[in-house]
């Protein structure tokens, strides 16, 4: 996320943190090889919510009605990899208290096994968010959620390539709300599911201690 626009919307660059991406110039005295893919993050205009966002995982309330979806997700390596078999896309909103995400993930067999918070959620199929409020690749946030509504939230002091000990795994997002809805049955291989969806509300206060300008959309 690059910056907030103070009026009724914020313009967000969806920053995908790529470990295959690197700078062609020296970075703090280190040299990195040329990246395999062009670094050009897609952008999304995130509007202020006009109605109350009801957090139940279903994405069918009035607040989301006219909110555009992002483009369908692709592999982290872009055109170097084939398109995913199943569609994933997201909507976003904000109000005075929260930054909202609504994700829809196609999956014919919705499956999840991890139930303990801060376990390695990506061993299940999951939805992940990376937030870097000031765009400097340091002091950024990661959140992962699986279809059982299990959360894994982390705080990164710096990029992985800077140091071995860069993650605060014990850190939790205060006031985080996540709600999942499964259109089908979870962990049942005998039938075909349609998708699962997740609604997430991240309080703006989460960013206060690490966001330099303390400028929020309101």
Features from the language model and the residues they span:
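Structural preference for beta-rich elements and adjacent junctions enriched in aromatics
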Residues: 25-218
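Hydrophobic h-region of N-terminal signal peptides that target proteins for export
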Residues: 14-24
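Sec-dependent signal peptide recognition
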Residues: 5-15
